[in-house]
Amino acid sequence: MPKRKYGMILVSLSVALVLAMIAGTSLGALGFQPGLVLQALSAPSDPANALVISVRLPRTLVAAMVGASLAVAGAAMQAVFRNPLAEPGITGVSSGAAVVAVLMIVSGLAAANPLMLPIGAFIGALLAVSIVQIVGGRGSSHTILLVGIALNAFLGAIIAAVIANAVNAEDARSAMFWLNGDLTGRTLSDIALVAVPIVVGMIGVMVYARELNLLVVGEAIAHTSGIRVERTRQIVLFAAALTTAAGVAITGIISFVGLVVPHVVRLVWGSDHRLVLPASALLGGTGLLLADLAARIIWQPVALQTGTVTALVGAPFLLVLVIRAVRDQQSPQGRCRGCRVAQKHACAPVVGVRIDHAAVPHSHVRGRHMAICPVVDGIRCRSSRVLGASDAFQGTPCSGFGDLLDALHRTGHHRCQHPSW
């Protein structure tokens, strides 16, 4: 995709985010009042403008920041684990924050100082991620994934036990309220507390956009391309965990933003993480702002929790993803309709090469799918034209998937040799 088009997409999403922020600060019990926002910004010390400055503006800024952080973290997790169902809390970040938050709420420590709850939740999230990295960091991405799932289950049991045995019913209710995720009561102090880790974590992920493009193809291909796979994976996971921990610390657990938004971006604009990550940040902020806006106005005068709205929207989307994946697996010969690469790939129609959704970003690929036969371990190429090498390299494992796709478009064919075919 041309850089000019990248810029147009990001500018459009930025405009949408600004409009959503204006709507978030302008809509209230008295309807849409954009003039009130301008008045409040021009005279912030006026007591008449306290509602906008102290309540609506912090809530809007928190929604934009947390939505962006969750979406970027989700996109990074899906790339590292090569799993479309990966989300920011998969490494135990959310559960670690939740355990500490619930303990502080039930014990009464959270009531002593408003800042103790987000600080404690942030520390708990980082401790959980550290455990996952220490236990599973030396293994593959699948090992980290399994350790994260086990830790989530263990911490979830602790949370359930603490809430079930809470002496004060009101404390138990407050803990459940926090677990569902909400933006009510957020202040400028909360923003100042988490702004730095959120921004640092997001930048840390975006710096590795090119490496994520290669990790999506496979760790073997990334390694042959000169990427230090283990180091890159650990840095990206820590950066994603950092920005997630900061967001969860002040809002509670808001589900599905980190799962849904990256998928929407990939479906619409492709899988190049140089675009996916910033676009996910902008669309994630916009999406959470709209979800919070819906939570405030759908059931007036009662306000729903923001996490409830995101779950109501995200759960059906997850079902659509599952149905679509099952349909693709059941398609004849694994052939992907509409995939231009598969149509030019001689292996696909002949031997039924499986077509996967883990698309590799490439300027000439218009579909959302790709043939994975060139990147499966053990498959060897006959064609030196595909590898762009001399005859001496025929029969060596495929590497450099971008060069391979270029050759596919130039030659119109590609032949593979595999012992099982």
Where does each model-flagged region fall?
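Short, low-complexity, intrinsically disordered N-terminal modules
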Residues: 338-339, 389, 412
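Intrinsic-disorder-associated, low-complexity terminal segments enriched in Asp/Asn/His/Tyr and depleted
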Residues: 345, 356-357, 362, 369, ...
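Cysteine-centered motifs
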Residues: 336-339, 347, 373, 381, ...
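Alpha-helical transmembrane segments in inner-membrane proteins
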Residues: 1-335, 363, 370, 419
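Conserved acid/base catalytic micro-environments in cytosolic active-site loops
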Residues: 340-341, 402
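Short, surface-exposed "cap/lid" segments of acyl-processing enzymes
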Residues: 342, 352, 360-387
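Active-site catalytic motif of lipid deacylating hydrolases and related acyltransferases
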Residues: 374-408
